[in-house]
Amino acid sequence: MTAVGLRERKRLDTRHRIVGAASGLFEKRGIDAVTVDEIAGAADIGKGTVYNYFEAKEDIVVALLVELDRTALASIAELPSQGMSVAEALDSASWRLIDNKVEYLPYVRVYLSRLFAAAEAAPELAEFSDQVDAALAALFERLLARPGMKRALPVDTLVLSFRTMHIGLVAQWALEGPPYATSRMLSRRHMALLAKGLEL
């Protein structure tokens, strides 16, 4: 293995240990009760090493959610399923990127506060945002390839519209809490409105 490959593997291993240690501590005691010193101790590294990877404890929370969303994002490639309407496909994509976080509601609240407070997105979040855009663009291309669809707007505008609606849905979901009935209804309605703009 080359020195660069070994160095990268060690970097990824250290990052994974930090995220894993933080996740375990957050689950046991809550995000606010855990310190960076405790995360470093649980990961068997120095506190400074944690800061080499993450600017703040909240950025570890963002990393955890990005990993959850990577899995949900992969499932969007399966959409639309056979017999699924455009509105159903968009709603399914929207809800997959929300429902995967039911067990992580406190994390989502931290994520939203970090997202809105930051002057610019963390590099990891910016990179993941590009992946989300690509997955959604591919979904819109598949939907627009169906008979009876119109291309009144460019795909990047459709992706931006979806993402704008979706961030509002995530905020509503995080504020509402279980059983998320209002958020679920709003997802269906917002995505139905977006779908109407695509159909002839």
What kind of feature is each model-predicted range?
Residues 76-78, 95-102, 110-117, 192-195:
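Helix-loop "lid/cap" segments that line or gate small-molecule binding pockets
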Residues 1-29, 33-45, 58-62:
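Basic, helix-initiating cap at the start of DNA-binding domains
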Residues 48:
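Key DNA-contact positions within bacterial/archaeal DNA-binding proteins
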Residues 100-122, 138, 171-175:
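Amphipathic alpha-helical segments used for helix-helix packing
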Residues 27, 51-55, 63, 67:
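Base-recognition residues in the alpha-helical recognition helix of bacterial helix-turn-helix
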Residues 70-73, 77, 103, 120-146, ...:
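Amphipathic alpha-helical packing segments from all-alpha helical-bundle domains
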Residues 63, 77-106, 150, 155-162, ...:
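Hydrophobic alpha-helical connector segments
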Residues 1-2, 99, 134-146, 164-171, ...:
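C-terminal peripheral helix-coil segments that are non-catalytic and often amphipathic
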